[in-house]
Amino acid sequence: MNAAKVETSSMGMLQRADLTAADCLQEGEMGKKIQGKCFRIISTVSPVKLYCCYGVIMVLTVAVIALSVALSVRNKIPAMEDREPCYTACPSGWIGFGSKCFYFSEDMGNWTFSQSSCVASNSHLALFHSLEELNFLKRYKGTSDHWIGLHRASTQHPWIWTDNTEYSNLVLTRGGGECGFLSDNGISSGRSYTHRKWICSKFVSSCKSRVGSVPRHV
């Protein structure tokens, strides 16, 4: 009797073991199927989406770079135009420099006569507002002294230009006279009745480009 019970118990354990093994095999096969599906999803869908994302990012990056370059070039164009040389359109016999025209006389006269001659040609005895202009006048005048537009009431008064603006003392004026003239040493002063050549200057409101006639420059 006991032997029969033992045999029956052993058979039950073997059946349960078989069921457990079958279940494990079934679960294993299902796991493989699920794993295969996951691999297929990862291998077919995710890379495509990832590549699409990469593509969109690259397109946007290129677009941003192109826009930045275009804006940079556009901002530089006005600056380049500002640096384009401006050629002053001066009357015959006058010399253009910057935004002014200058006339260097061959005749001689006192300071008052020289100023009157300049006024007759819609100008004044020469004014300068920078060292570049002053160096140009010194270079072009030759060896002769020339009256310019500086004058003062006395040595106790400031220097005034012929347009009634005060001289900034950009360059020291030598001498104790009441009228200024340009010499090889720079700006000097002397008596108004002394006869010298003179320089007239006037502003111009327009410039000529490179195309067409170009006035004489030094």
Swiss-Prot record:
InterPro entries with a match to the protein in the record:
C-type_lectin-like, C-type_lectin-like/link_sf, C-type_lectin/matrix_domain, CTDL_fold, NKR-like_CTLD
List of glycosylated residues: 110
Chief subcellular site? membrane
Q: Which stretches face the Cytoplasmic side?
A: 1-52
> Where can this protein be found?
Cell membrane
Tell me which residues make up the C-type lectin domain. 97-201
Mode of membrane association: Single-pass type II membrane protein
The protein's name is: C-type lectin domain family 2 member H
